[in-house]
Amino acid sequence: MSQTPREATPAQQSRRAARELAVQGLYQWQMTGKSITAVESEFRAQIADEDLEDHENWHKVMGIADLALFHELLHNVAADREAIDKTIAPLLDRRLEDLDRIELAILRLGAYELKYRLEVPYRAVINEGIELAKAFGATDGHKYVNGILDKLASRLRSAEVAARRR
């Protein structure tokens, strides 16, 4: 039986869960100033925390997440933050510091994937950013994320974008 276009494969679900965790980890890193290693350790420790208010959901997400991808995204976005921010900043209608922190985390993640994870189609990066913004961002934050990532894709992956638009 073939899957409908809207059904995510287990591998896609695993990558999406990794991105969800990475955005939450980046948000925590931005807000607390803790090291990215400490943030990751806290996330992994929460798997075993039976007293966690949302333990069942947390365990489910961590259970399906591609933890190697989570680690890569979390650490590499943090390590390359300055370069990523310089790539994003010219596309914004406000200062980077004035962005909603969750939207900033999503934009940083999307910029990293557009720049370095070339095996991921640019449309998938944009769609994941939109879904993350719908799940975690402000009411219309997904529209802003969509616009910025679309502009960024045109700059970073011009050949791929041009081929898609033909």
Curated annotation (Swiss-Prot):
Q: Which gene encodes it?
A: nusB
This molecule's function is given as: Involved in transcription antitermination. Required for transcription of ribosomal RNA (rRNA) genes. Binds specifically to the boxA antiterminator sequence of the ribosomal RNA (rrn) operons.
* The keyword Transcription regulation is annotated on this UniProt entry: yes
What does the sequence similarity comment in the record state about its family? Belongs to the NusB family.
Q: What HAMAP family does this protein's entry cite?
A: NusB (MF_00073)
Which protein is depicted?
A: Transcription antitermination protein NusB
Q: Which NCBIfam families match?
A: nusB (TIGR01951)
One GO cellular component from the entry?
cytosol
Q: Which organism is it from?
A: Chromohalobacter salexigens (strain ATCC BAA-138 / DSM 3043 / CIP 106854 / NCIMB 13768 / 1H11)
Q: Which PANTHER family match?
A: ANTITERMINATION NUSB DOMAIN-CONTAINING PROTEIN, N UTILIZATION SUBSTANCE PROTEIN B-RELATED
Molecular function GO labels:
RNA binding
What GO biological process terms are annotated to this protein in UniProt?
A: DNA-templated transcription termination; transcription antitermination
Show the Pfam families listed in the entry: NusB
- Which UniProt key words apply to this protein? RNA-binding, Transcription, Transcription antitermination, Transcription regulation
